[in-house]
From Swiss-Prot:
The gene is alaS. Its EC number is 6.1.1.7. Its cofactor is Zn(2+). The lineage of its organism: Bacteria, Bacillati, Cyanobacteriota, Cyanophyceae, Synechococcales. One of its GO terms (biological process) is alanyl-tRNA aminoacylation. Catalyzes the attachment of alanine to tRNA(Ala) in a two-step reaction: alanine is first activated by ATP to form Ala-AMP and then transferred to the acceptor end of tRNA(Ala). Also edits incorrectly charged Ser-tRNA(Ala) and Gly-tRNA(Ala) via its editing domain. Gene3D superfamilies: 2.40.30.130, 3.10.310.40, 3.30.54.20, 6.10.250.550, Bira Bifunctional Protein, Domain 2, Threonyl-trna Synthetase, Chain A, domain 2. This is Alanine--tRNA ligase. InterPro entries: aa-tRNA-synth_II/BPL/LPL, Ala-tRNA-lgiase_IIc, Ala-tRNA-ligase_IIc_anticod-bd, Ala-tRNA-synth_IIc_core, Ala-tRNA-synth_IIc_N, Ala-tRNA_ligase, Ala_tRNA_ligase_euk/bac, DHHA1_dom. Consists of three domains; the N-terminal catalytic domain, the editing domain and the C-terminal C-Ala domain. The editing domain removes incorrectly charged amino acids, while the C-Ala domain, along with tRNA(Ala), serves as a bridge to cooperatively bring together the editing and aminoacylation centers thus stimulating deacylation of misacylated tRNAs. It holds the Pfam family tRNA-synt_2c. One of its GO terms (molecular function) is aminoacyl-tRNA deacylase activity.
């Protein structure tokens, strides 16, 4: 035995570490967990421990070693409705695995699995049942003859249960699974592995030995592989002797925090509350890892999954009686629980908590209104929620369809999912029609044709001029053999000095030329590592195979390079002055400006902006020489290089280093020294979405032009205000003070006019059934003055006052204003100022509203003013007469 038993393994961390240590001693290379965002475009999230190795199994990528072992974080949402309901369903889980790439096979896999579970984890043989594929006699023989398992402990299952395949064709093979028996006293007769209360499958050994062709025929693979998976949460349940995975030390500390916030006890809670506690506990782990791996909440793809999980957490928190914001507190526990094994959680702590906080606040703002509408639908007694209503809940209130279905099912109501999808498709069509100006020519046939070309070699970092050969010509998205003068084309070359749009940096411009041909290139795009040069043929005929030269505009390349380096300096300055957790959310590096999007819940103050500009400009003046090197991604990250949050990188990366200032993974073009930037100026800072801010800035000549324009503006203002530039602030400040004083004088005059006008009409109030009614026209008063007049009249007339004023503030504008003010007794008999004023204003093609005792409105038809006043008088007369009759 190569692993010496020191103590009984119990905790989740001990289980994980023991697994990796055991296989490391068996010469397996320990591979760190891959991101939840997979390289595989066929899946949205990393759903299995073997997924990062799929290219190796398929022969598409070199194996990292002959043997590997890992603890891989995974997310699955296909059974989300079972999370919290069953003992073992999760969205987030960790899969322990050992892998062989053409090295050892069944015998070693089975022997080592047995050694691990019996010697290291110390499981009793009496608690272990093994399943094998019913045609896999080889595995059964190893279990019985070499391991010594009694045949009664082996269950033979069919292809559906014990045969793994990657699809209808391709690598496949039989499985052997290890089950834990919680009730061995029931004996070995008539074993039913589907009995979830008795058995739990905890270790799956996949023997990848065949290739299945289109006819279903199996042939032996040249290299046979091993792919295994052990659920960490399941093994923790077994070794910690818990009723379910949720009560293990991997999840239960999170649940305890929820109980603390909700002021409830887990073990004495009813089943409904326990389900909510488990759902929040499970989703917490998924959410913190998704955000840490670069997923942001949205209505699409992974972002939608994240948003859905957070919104389920908020709702189940409300079911537990939690009415205040609580998710960041829960997430903090999850981060502390897992950060030792996943350091990225600690590094991204602030970012994770901020994203969760913003999303929770956003959903809480609409949840109450949405739940109210949903409750009305449920309480109406109907047994089906229409697709239209379900879509309204989604579109207006942010309710994911799944949440509506979940709440409806809890109340034995169905949802018209098909109708919802029809509404969703209709909206997409409307959006598509509204965005018909978007260029979609890069899709369709062009997308398919791109696969015909090899990767374009980029040789433009150190040279702007180079020779090349034309490999492809696209005319209107169609691949053609030649194109002539005047036509707009997309050109594919074997190599190019043109930078293709990537990493936020725009594509280069310039010319592609030969003795007989000239093409003005106005943009360069990348598609699947193929550079597409967009341009107009100014001279000659282009043909496939033609030898040409590429010549990039040096001035524009220099501008882009300066702005790209400035972007790196800006990010470093933001980290130092605003928050170390600032991370890039997007960028634009253009010729004339740069734009940088970053995470921040608060606006950047003017003082901070000034400090950022000063710091960046100091780095520019210090004339730092940039160092650019290629190295392995792991080496770069160890040296402290900053990677864009959520971005995918190759194993070898390009590192742009401004010594002592900035170090980033970047494929863009840059200056040689920071002094080439000249100067740096931030021209705007704004919020573009929840938790994301945007800075636009200038460098080089663009910054100088900006300063020149501002200087010209200052000179114009100096001439206008007859003051030198140094006196402008004082001059404008004095003008503002004068303006404020003049406005006060004007308002005083308006108030005096209003007082005079309302004084002249206050005696005209009529008494109807003890109420003082005053309905009158007062022209020449603005909204504030008219309101003041109405309130003063109401105060003068007392609790039984009913004041309605209408007037034309300015005859030239041909607009009307109305005000209704009611005393307390008028409100008590049922009059409502807001409703009354709306009826009055409607006569004059207007509208308004307000409180029961005071309201205001505007209208357009001044010719109907007298009709509106007559209506008000008649309405009040009838209403008060009716009240008198009562």
């Amino acid at each position: 035995m190569t692993s010496q038993l020191i103590k009984k393994i119990v905790t989740g961390d001990e289980i994980r570490n023991a697994f990796l240590k055991f296989y490391s001693e068996k010469l397996h290379k320990i591979i760190p967990s891959a991101s939840l965002i997979p390289d595989d475009p066929t899946v949205m999230l990393t759903i299995a421990g073997m997924l990062p190795f799929k290219p190796v199994f398929l022969g598409l990528k070199e194996r990292p070693s002959k043997r590997a072992t890992s603890s891989q974080k995974c997310i699955r949402t296909n059974d989300i409705e079972n999370v919290g309901v069953t003992a073992r369903h999760h969205t987030f889980f960790e899969m322990l695995g050992n892998f062989s790439f053409g090295d050892y096979f069944k015998r070693e896999a089975i022997q080592w699995a047995w050694e691990l579970v019996t010697n290291i984890y110390q499981l009793s043989v009496e608690n272990i049942i093994v399943s094998v594929f019913h045609e896999d006699e080889e595995s059964a023989k190893i279990w019985i003859d070499e391991i010594g398992i009694h045949p009664d402990r082996i269950v033979k299952l069919g292809e559906e249960d014990n045969f793994w395949s990657s699809g209808k064709t391709g690598p496949c093979g039989p499985c052997s699974e290890l089950y834990y028996d919680f009730h061995p006293e029931k004996g070995l007769q008539n074993i039913d592995l589907e009995d979830g209360d008795r058995f739990i499958e905890f270790y799956n050994l996949v023997f990848m030995q065949y290739n299945r062709d289109q006819n279903g025929k199996l042939t032996d693979l040249k290299f046979k592989n091993i792919d295994t998976g052990m659920g960490l949460e399941r093994m923790a349940q077994i070794l910690q002797k818990k009723q379910n995975n949720y009560e293990t030390d991997l999840i239960f500390p999170i649940i305890q925090k929820i109980c603390e916030i909700a002021n409830i006890d887990y073990f004495s809670s009813d089943d409904k509350n326990k389900i909510s506690l488990k759902i929040i506990g499970d989703h917490t782990r998924a959410v913190i890892h998704l955000i840490s791996d670069g997923v942001a909440a949205s209505n699409l793809g992974r972002g939608y999954i994240l948003r859905r999980l957070i919104r389920r957490m908020v709702r189940h928190g409300r079911l537990l009686g939690i009415t205040n914001e609580f998710l960041p507190h829960i997430a903090s526990v999850g981060i502390n629980l897992m950060q030792n094994n996943y350091p990225d959680l600690k590094n991204n702590n602030d970012l994770i908590l901020n994203e969760i906080k913003i999303e929770e606040i956003r959903f809480r703002e609409t949840l109450e209104r949405g739940e109210k509408l949903l409750d009305e639908l449920i309480s109406s007694g109907q047994k089906l929620i229409s697709g239209f209503k379900a879509f309204e809940l989604y579109d207006t209130y942010g309710f994911p369809l799944e949440l509506t279905v979940e709440i409806a099912e809890e109340n034995s109501i169905s949802v018209d999912v098909k109708g919802f999808e029809e509404e969703m498709n209709a909206q997409k069509e409307r959006a598509k029609a509204a965005s018909s100006n978007i260029d979609l020519t890069l899709e369709g046939s062009l997308e398919r044709e791109i696969d015909l070309f090899n990767k374009t070699v980029f040789n433009g970092y150190n040279s702007l001029l180079s020779e090349a050969e034309i490999k492809g010509i696209f005319l209107d998205s169609t691949l053609v053999k030649q194109a002539s003068e005047g036509q707009k084309v997309l050109i594919v070359l074997d190599q190019t000095t043109f930078y293709g749009e990537s990493g936020g940096q725009v594509g280069d411009i310039g010319t592609i030329f030969s003795k007989d041909v000239e093409v003005l290139v106005d943009n360069v795009m990348r598609k699947k590592n193929v550079f597409l040069h967009h341009g107009t043929i100014k001279k000659g005929i282009l043909t496939i195979g033609q030898k040409v030269k590429t010549n990039v505009s040096s001035s524009n390349r220099a501008k882009a390079a300066a702005n790209h380096t400035a972007t790196h300096l800006l990010q470093s300055a933001l980290k130092l002055i605003v928050n170390e957790s600032v991370g890039q959310k997007g960028s634009l590096v253009a010729f004339n400006k740069l734009r940088f999007d970053f995470n921040s819940s608060n606006p950047i103050s003017k003082d901070q902006i000034s400090k950022i500009e000063t710091l960046v400009n100091s780095w520019i003046m210090e004339n730092h020489a940039l160092e650019i090197k290629n190295m392995s991604k792991s080496e770069a990250l160890e040296k402290g290089a900053v990677a864009m949050f959520g971005e995918k990188y190759d194993d070898e990366v390009r590192v742009v280093n401004v010594p002592g200032v900035s170090m980033e993974l970047c494929g863009g073009t840059h200056v040689k020294t920071t002094s080439e930037l000249g100067s740096f100026k931030i021209i705007s800072e704004e919020g573009i979405s929840a938790g994301v801010r945007r800075i636009e800035a200038l460098s080089g000549q663009s910054a100088l032009d900006y300063f020149s324009d501002r200087n010209a503006l200052v000179n114009q203002l100096s001439d206008l205000l007859k003051a030198n530039p140094n006196q402008l602030f004082e001059r404008v400040n004095n003008l503002q003070s004068e303006l404020i004083n003049k406005n006060k004088e004007i308002q005083k005059m308006k108030d005096e006019i209003a007082y005079f006008k309302y004084s002249s009409i206050k005696s005209s109030a009529e008494i109807v059934n003890s109420f003082s009614i005053l309905v009158n026209q007062i022209d020449g008063l603005d909204g504030n003055s008219l309101q003041s007049a109405a309130l003063n009249l109401t105060s003068h007339l007392g609790n039984k006052a009913i004041v309605i004023l209408g007037g034309i503030p300015n005859p030239e504008n041909r607009k009307l204003l109305f005000v209704v003010s009611l005393g307390d007794d008028a409100v008590k008999i049922g009059l409502h100022a807001g409703k009354l004023i709306n009826e009055i204003a409607r006569i004059c093609s207007g509208g308004g509203g307000g409180k029961p005792n005071f309201a205001q409105a505007g209208a357009k038809d001044i010719d109907k003013l007298s009709d509106a006043i007559d209506y008000a008088k008649n309405y009040l007369q009838k209403t008060l007469d009716s009240h008198s009759d009562k």
